[in-house]
Amino acid sequence: MKNIFEYSFPSIRYLALRWPKSKHLVKKYVMSNQKKPDLFKLSLCCLKDLNYHCKYPIRKSLKLLSKKCSENYTYNSYHDQHHFKSVIVISSIFANILSLKNNEKIFLILLALTHDMNHQGRRILSTPYYQELKTLKKLKPYVFKHFVNYKIWIRFKRILLNTYFPKIVNSTDDIVEKILLDVDIICSMMFGHINGLILSKRLKHEIKFEKNREELYKGFLSLLEKKKLHLDISKKSCAR
């Protein structure tokens, strides 16, 4: 428990060793939206706990991207810093459990941090992938500078576009993609019905959903029946 990025919050390694029994500790941190998280510090701490040494050029780009992901000029109440925080932490726990390779660790954290970077305001339903394509356009100069080459960028682009919620990805051999797609979904449902409704309330406000939050959450669960979780640890994380 040496690496603590929030007061009284244990390290990723500690949580991973006890997962899913340690889920209640993560719930308290994930569900709290009182304090704005330091996404740069959080990302560095998660990488450190994953035994990844972050060199200066990468640190610099990560800091700039963390700052951009902390911007919330449309006052999003769901796709905000707290959603990024949740995806980063849970993805890091899964990466630790699955013993991800070194270069995959920074790739995963980068995707977890930035996958909804330009998801500002209401989704434009008439234009599929609108927010995702905006995110990729903004990300490209940062990511190419220190993180990836063209081949890896194609992989990065594919994974990020597959986070588009209506898209159904039946199978993939990409371990980073499996983690990100699963975590992006289960962080809204793995902490039980009551917490699912709390998160639905935040999303309801953001997308100006006219019906009640129960209807929104039911609709979310209904859509999930068409999708599937790719990892056994994801399924165990959602078990009561």
State the predicted function of each range:
Residues 123-130:
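Metal-dependent catalytic cores of enzymes that make or break cyclic nucleotides
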Residues 61-69, 108-115, 156-164, 179-184:
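Short alpha-helical scaffolding segments that buttress acidic/His motifs in well-ordered protein cores
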Residues 57-62, 98-105:
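Short N-terminal amphipathic alpha-helices
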Residues 70-73, 78:
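Conserved P-loop NTPase mechanochemical-coupling segment
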Residues 2-44, 77-85, 89-102, 114, ...:
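Divalent metal-dependent phosphate-bond-processing catalytic cores, especially two-metal-ion Mg2+/Mn2+ enzymes
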Residues 37-71:
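Short alpha-helical hairpin
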Residues 76, 84, 91, 107-108, ...:
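Histidine- and acidic-residue-rich, metal-dependent catalytic cores
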